[in-house]
Design a protein with these regions (language model features):
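Extended extracellular/luminal ectodomain segments enriched in beta-structured repeat modules
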Residues: 21-31
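C-terminal outer-membrane/trafficking sorting elements
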Residues: 336, 451-498
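A short, polar beta-strand/turn micro-motif
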Residues: 24, 70-86, 171, 175-201, ...
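Short, surface-exposed beta-strand/strand-loop-strand elements in extracellular ectodomains
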Residues: 32-49
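OB-fold nucleic-acid-binding modules
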Residues: 81-280
Length: 498
């Protein structure tokens, strides 16, 4: 179109303009001047500038959406670069063995003999979405891949997908290639018979062998406020997890679950809550010093490293309440503060545990975990008898007992013993227990009653001679053996045989 000496190219709505370069060449960019109102069939158009978007293109068509008034068109092109070969791999392990920057077609197979790929976790959307995928051989981050079915945790994947394998800042990624990557040959399906994915338990020394995977590291101690563990693992809540995520504190021992996402040289774990597995579980180990939190921590999970027995009484104390529903099968007793003839009386009809208080317990369980509790900044308590002479003392951490007979422990035969020396830590009481502080010269026993003032038969008896009478005042012998059920007077005290 020539108007007053100005020449312009006009093409109208729904018409097309195709620009091509000679064979063996590729268009790298096109610059227009004037008014351009069109779309393109390949590459990327931004205003008056078009680029090939890193694709090999020797012809591009523009379709007008309205009238176009073009003054000039500058087409930049170069020799076609050799097409890079596309590697073929059959597992994530094989993918991660490639050099960074390699284009590859990843084949994921299903079935018992297949790689059984599963989606672990999805973060973000669109061209920056991170979908962490695990198969039987390893894990990788699918990055910027827009699937035909949205990625969701627990899905299984089978089929083929082409992308570029890169390692960025230590993170292995399988990235989308513009105009190449699609999921048309990839089956993305919800689980049918498969169990929900779970974290892989690893040791910190194997961190770099499990990049992009969902892992669990147990017994990690936080050594500073920067949430760094003794093994150099750093907790970074990059995903912004809020669901059942409780930030730990310096000195805490925790089980940590999350995605292994290195940050250059930093070994980071990005915590996630998934499939009822908490990102942080506090650990209280009877063998290790326990550090109390500065303030109460609500909705926490706590794992105890301790084995209990239903065959004998043992002492127990924890810095959180335990409701009756979480103590199924347990028998619990508290010190009533009553003492009779050096016998400390316990009430064995308790149904729950209060933070900080010392208890006796019978329970058949090992290393129990408690969910949704409040970890309290409550120091261990001491329960002292009414006369002030006998105490039942709770401890969370290992405690060195005195060797002067004033601090005693409960043995598995339910007798109260005192350490005679400190050799080989013979006087070391484990944490999550309680001990007895008593007069050094006293021969102390324990007894149980359903109510504080009830009469009961002691669990421990001395060799002191007995005189046993029935309620009619008749002498019936010097032993309790073979007596029928009933109420008796033994050395001046009422006793019930059931």
């Amino acid at each position: 179109w020539n108007s007053k000496g100005n020449i312009e190219l006009r093409f109208y709505a729904n018409s097309e303009l195709t620009l091509s370069v000679p064979a063996g060449k590729q268009i790298t960019s096109i610059v227009f001047t004037g008014k351009l109102k069109s779309t393109c069939n390949s590459g990327a158009l931004n205003g008056l500038s078009w680029t090939n978007n890193d694709s090999v293109i020797n012809s591009v068509t523009f379709k007008a959406s309205a009238t176009n008034n073009i003054n000039t068109i500058t087409v930049n092109y170069s020799a076609t670069q050799p097409t890079e070969p596309i590697a073929k791999v059959n597992s994530i392990k094989e993918l991660k063995a490639l050099a960074s920057g390699t284009k590859a077609t990843l084949t994921l197979t299903d079935g018992n003999e297949g790689s059984m790929a599963r989606v672990l976790y999805v973060f973000g959307t669109g061209n920056t979405q991170e979908a962490y995928v695990r198969d039987a051989t390893g894990a990788v981050c699918f990055y910027g891949i827009n699937p035909n079915v949205a990625f969701v945790s627990n899905q299984h994947l089978a089929g083929q997908i082409t992308g570029e394998y890169v390692v960025e800042n230590g993170v292995p990624r399988f990235k989308a290639i513009p105009n190449v990557t699609n999921t048309s040959l990839l089956v993305i399906a919800a689980p049918v018979t498969e169990q929900a994915v779970q974290p892989k338990e690893i040791e910190a020394k194997n961190y770099l062998d499990n990049t992009a995977d969902w892992v669990c590291l147990k017994d990690q101690t936080l050594i500073n406020d920067a949430l760094t563990t003794q093994d150099g693992i750093v907790i970074n809540n990059r995903f912004g997890s809020n669901e059942k995520y409780t930030a730990p504190y310096q000195g805490a021992i925790i089980d940590l679950a999350g995605i292994v996402v290195p940050n250059s040289e930093r070994k980071e774990i990005n915590p996630i809550y998934l499939n009822n597995h908490r990102p942080v579980t506090f650990v209280i180990d009877e063998e290790k010093t326990f550090v109390l939190p500065q303030s109460d921590i609500t909705n926490a999970a706590v794992r105890l490293k301790r084995t209990f027995s239903a065959d004998h009484w043992d002492t127990f104390a924890v810095p959180f309440d335990i409701e009756a529903k979480d103590l199924a099968g347990a028998k619990i007793a508290t010190f009533t503060k009553q003492v009779e003839n050096n016998t400390m009386i316990f009430d064995d009809k308790q149904s729950q545990i209060e933070a900080g208080k010392p208890y006796l317990i019978k329970w058949n369980i090992e290393n129990p975990t408690f969910e949704g509790i409040t970890l309290k900044a409550t120091t261990p308590e001491t329960v002292t008898s009414n006369d002030g002479q006998y105490s039942f003392v709770a401890v969370y951490s290992p405690k060195t007992l005195a060797v002067d007979k004033t601090e005693r422990y409960l043995s598995t035969d339910e007798s109260l013993n005192y350490p005679v020396s400190a050799d080989n830590k013979a006087n070391l009481l484990k944490g999550l227990h309680a001990y007895y502080r008593v007069p050094a010269t006293a021969t102390v026993k324990i007894s149980f009653s359903s109510t504080p003032n009830a009469i009961t038969r002691p669990y421990m008896l001395t060799d002191k001679a007995m005189k046993v009478y029935n309620l009619n005042g008749q002498y019936v012998g010097s032993t309790l053996s073979n007596l029928p059920k009933g109420v008796y007077i033994v050395n001046g005290h009422k006793l019930i045989i059931k």
